[in-house]
Amino acid sequence: MPLLDSFTVDHTIMKAPAVRVAKTMKTPHGDEITVFDLRFCVPNKEVMPERGIHTLEHLFAGFMRNHLNGNGVEIIDISPMGCRTGFYMSLIGTPDEQRVADAWKAAMADVLKVTDQRKIPELNEYQCGTYHMHSLEEAQEIAKGIIDRGVRINHNEELALPKEKLTELHI
């Protein structure tokens, strides 16, 4: 099985909250695609609660688009990581990490302004696969934590696992 890019970085030294360019690529037509690792939690030390991350998924995608789309950037998708320590964001364009960090903080401020669980987009059985598994309170606790802690930038060259370590791990 091929080694995925996300498994070539050392999760034991990864900072959070932090933005990292996980991957860049070009489409056959030359469009730049960037995938960002938006790390909310320190890997193997913190985890977002399932109801909170689910609610955040519904809110975060729209709020990030409000703050980041434009000037050559268009978000394709924002999806939670299975490990519940962050989200992956795929987009057209190549915004720098600070622009993404600023949009992320603004999106978290928007999450804190939501006053009622009924205001969560697509919170119904027709548009959500587990519509009863939500918590606005948990999502707002996550958002407050991001704002309080601030958002750093993780650099791949600082996190790269040495080839010897990858060999030792039988990868």
Curated annotation (Swiss-Prot):
- Gene Ontology MF term list: iron ion binding; S-ribosylhomocysteine lyase activity
Keyword Repeat tagged: no
Q: Give the binding site residues for Fe cation.
A: H54, H58, C128
Q: What is its EC number?
A: 4.4.1.21
Q: Which cofactor does it need?
A: Fe cation
Gene3D superfamilies the UniProt entry points to:
S-ribosylhomocysteinase (LuxS) (3.30.1360.80)
The question of whether Metal-binding is a record keyword is answered with yes
Q: Which InterPro entries match?
A: LuxS_sf, Metalloenz_LuxS/M16, S-ribosylhomocysteinase
- Keywords attached to this entry: Autoinducer synthesis, Iron, Lyase, Metal-binding, Quorum sensing
One GO biological process this protein is involved in is: quorum sensing
**Pfam families annotated for this entry?**
LuxS
Q: Which domain of life does the protein's organism represent?
A: Bacteria
Question: What does the record say about how the cofactor binds?
Answer: Binds 1 Fe cation per subunit.
Recorded catalytic activity of this chain's protein? S-(5-deoxy-D-ribos-5-yl)-L-homocysteine = (S)-4,5-dihydroxypentane-2,3-dione + L-homocysteine
The UniProt entry's sequence similarity note says:
Belongs to the LuxS family.
Role, per record = Involved in the synthesis of autoinducer 2 (AI-2) which is secreted by bacteria and is used to communicate both the cell density and the metabolic potential of the environment. The regulation of gene expression in response to changes in cell density is called quorum sensing. Catalyzes the transformation of S-ribosylhomocysteine (RHC) to homocysteine (HC) and 4,5-dihydroxy-2,3-pentadione (DPD).
The subunit structure is: Homodimer.
Q: What name goes with this protein?
A: S-ribosylhomocysteine lyase
- Give the classification, highest ranks: Bacteria, Pseudomonadati, Pseudomonadota, Gammaproteobacteria, Enterobacterales
